[in-house]
């Protein structure tokens, strides 16, 4: 790998290992590659190879989060017993402007031409995820974030990449200022990115429904996992305030030692207990008028 041309914008990004089941493997590659790349490879094989250089860029600002993609590329090149020159323009976690090349990849066209599909799949979304994670952590510096990518992604490969993006974006902010950032993810596979051995999480809505009450669900969970911090989902019955206070009173000892949390996972179609649309606006107007006025103004400008 050639030496980086631009210094990183961050102090330190901790080196982490990446899941070793990098896909697609050489046997799977042709079935998930765009046909026109496969046909181009056949043409090059027929009429003669040549040296090429790929410049990979994004059409929008992102955070550089290339390691999974480049690790996969180097794995495939090694399997093919070939060589390429990889020249990174940005260190991991650095700002990348729209249209700026992030990395140059040079080598045999025959070796590289059918790798573009899988390579780009691992770059675009990951870099955007890192950018979004950075924005979240920067905006709410004293908030702990949990990466819940697993159930929202189109497969485990995408979930791995989203967890990595969350890690990079979070580390970027933490290297520059005092911020908590992402403290974990939902699954064991990528927990090491956040210096954990296991995924984090307590209860989905299904457990509250199974238990029949918010308090009963909390009691059942705590009985089963007494040494785990307790995060209680309090919106199942639409009584967020009533159930939230009940949980705090019932688990006062956990609240006192900082291991009790309340979780809201309410969709945008309803409002917190006792409020409706008008009531919600009235609360904002009384307590934080600039928040909703600024939001409305930004919508008008958009």
Language model region names:
Residues 2-113, 117-126:
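Flexible, solvent-exposed loop/hinge segments and secondary-structure transition points
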Residues 300-302:
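Conserved small/polar residues in nucleotide/adenosyl-binding loops
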